[in-house]
Design a protein with these regions (language model features):
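Short alpha-helical scaffolding segments that buttress acidic/His motifs in well-ordered protein cores
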Residues: 7, 204-211
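Short, solvent-exposed amphipathic alpha-helical segments in soluble enzyme
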Residues: 29, 47-61, 79-81, 161-167, ...
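Conserved phosphate-handling catalytic cores of large alpha/beta enzymes
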Residues: 70-141
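Long, structured protein-protein interaction/assembly regions in large complexes
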Residues: 36-38, 43
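Charge-patterned, long linear interaction tracts outside catalytic cores
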Residues: 117-192
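Long, highly charged low-complexity segments enriched in Glu/Asp and Lys/Arg with interspersed Ser/Thr
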Residues: 216-240
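Short hydrophobic alpha-helical runs that function as membrane-insertion/retention elements
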Residues: 41, 60-66
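Single conserved hydrophobic/aromatic residue that forms the stacking wall/gate
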Residues: 1-5, 9
Length: 240
């Protein structure tokens, strides 16, 4: 390839969350203060709407890359630019979303114990002791839970999906999902204060399913249970 052809990525335009078209250099320059050498991207604006709203509220930008061919293109751009990393908008909890406050050692130790307790309660309620659970103190107190999938795991999944088109198995390497629990949320605080409560398991399942639903990855079986559970919660709330 000629140098002009191999450097075509430099002239590639990326559509951002505001509908503006930017070059790679523009994307990196506009966001270097908040996430240097990282470009967040969206593959499905409807499915990832919760994450998009979080990014907009925090003043963080992302680009829209909805096509299957975008994945190998991103890898090509990363190879051409040392240190550059593309991360899907739901790959991790950005530091900007986290509450930043200095605490003493005693408080940190208590937070660690609370996080371990919450993880155990959620795993037991959901019935999955292998579930990855991370507890964070997020600025948005209204958000109780969310699902993240590491970029490495997602790319492996994408590769397996392409492989399955030629007779391979797409479920050989399941995505490494993490349930992120917001310690600042009122419902999560309730779970922590009532870890052995009668209604706590139902609440944990509801928060997990809501996170999966927002992530667009709720299975038909869990969807059926979620609808039934939601109906039961409303009956209890209104005495029906």
């Amino acid at each position: 390839l000629s140098s002009a052809a191999s450097d075509v990525y430099k002239r590639q335009l990326y559509k951002n969350l505001d509908g503006k078209y930017l070059t790679l250099a523009d994307c990196l320059e506009e966001n270097k203060e908040k996430h240097e050498n990282k470009i967040f991207y969206v593959t499905d604006e409807k499915e990832q709407s919760q994450y998009i709203n979080m990014f907009k509220e925090a003043g963080i930008d992302a680009v829209i890359l909805p096509n299957p061919i975008d994945s190998p293109f991103m890898q090509h751009v990363e190879q051409k630019n040392e240190g550059l990393k593309f991360l899907r908008i739901d790959a991790d909890v950005n530091e900007t979303f986290k509450e930043t406050e200095e605490t003493d050692e005693a408080a940190k130790e208590q937070e660690k114990k609370d996080a371990e307790t919450l993880a155990e309660v959620f795993k037991k309620a959901i019935g999955n002791d292998k579930l990855n659970v991370k507890v964070e103190k997020l600025k948005n107190e209204g958000l109780a839970s969310m699902i993240t999938v590491s970029e490495e795991s997602r790319r492996m999944q994408d590769m397996m999906k392409m492989y399955s088109m030629y007779g391979g198995g797409s479920d050989m390497f399941p995505a490494e999902e993490t349930l992120v629990i917001n310690a600042n949320n009122g419902l999560v605080k309730y779970v922590l204060a009532n870890k052995d409560g009668e209604k706590t398991p139902m609440l944990c399942e509801q928060l997990y399913d809501l996170a999966k639903l927002a992530h667009g990855s709720l299975s038909p079986e869990r969807m059926t249970k979620f609808i039934a559970r939601s109906s039961e919660i409303m009956k209890e709330e209104y005495g029906a």
